[in-house]
């Protein structure tokens, strides 16, 4: 249940420094957030899919670690990213 190529390209263009910047922290967090939102829609239909839920928890944990790193590295960009992604932090 990964994101489509076009969705990834749009996220990279929106949050990256250029169209090929898929490795920066902001882009990684945005991609993980999109994948989490996609999986939440999946779980609305498939409530008993516990194997995928474990994968979701792994992705959420990875995003949380990246958010902590990004907050310590660049607070201004962190707050901007949180507002753009509508996260509750």
From Swiss-Prot:
GO cellular component: cytosolic small ribosomal subunit
Keywords linked to the UniProt accession: Ribonucleoprotein, Ribosomal protein, RNA-binding, rRNA-binding
GO molecular function terms attached to this record: rRNA binding; structural constituent of ribosome
Lineage: superkingdom: Bacteria
Matches recorded under InterPro entries: Ribosomal_uS15, Ribosomal_uS15_bac-type, uS15_NS1_RNA-bd_sf
GO biological process, any: translation
Gene3D superfamilies the UniProt entry points to: 6.10.250.3130, S15/NS1, RNA-binding
Family the UniProt entry places it in: Belongs to the universal ribosomal protein uS15 family.
Protein role: One of the primary rRNA binding proteins, it binds directly to 16S rRNA where it helps nucleate assembly of the platform of the 30S subunit by binding and bridging several RNA helices of the 16S rRNA.
Subunit and partners: Part of the 30S ribosomal subunit. Forms a bridge to the 50S subunit in the 70S ribosome, contacting the 23S rRNA.
PANTHER family: RIBOSOMAL PROTEIN S15, BACTERIAL AND ORGANELLAR (PTHR23321), SMALL RIBOSOMAL SUBUNIT PROTEIN US15M (PTHR23321:SF26)
Protein name: Small ribosomal subunit protein uS15
């Amino acid at each position: 249940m990964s994101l489509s190529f076009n969705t990834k390209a749009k996220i990279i263009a929106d949050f990256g420094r250029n169209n090929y910047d898929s490795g920066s922290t902001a882009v990684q967090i945005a991609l993980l957030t999109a994948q989490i939102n996609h999986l939440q829609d999946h779980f609305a239909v498939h409530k008993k899919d516990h194997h995928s839920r474990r994968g979701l928890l792994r992705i959420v944990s990875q995003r949380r670690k990246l958010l902590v790193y990004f907050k310590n590295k660049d607070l201004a960009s962190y707050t901007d990213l949180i507002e753009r992604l509508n996260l509750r932090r």
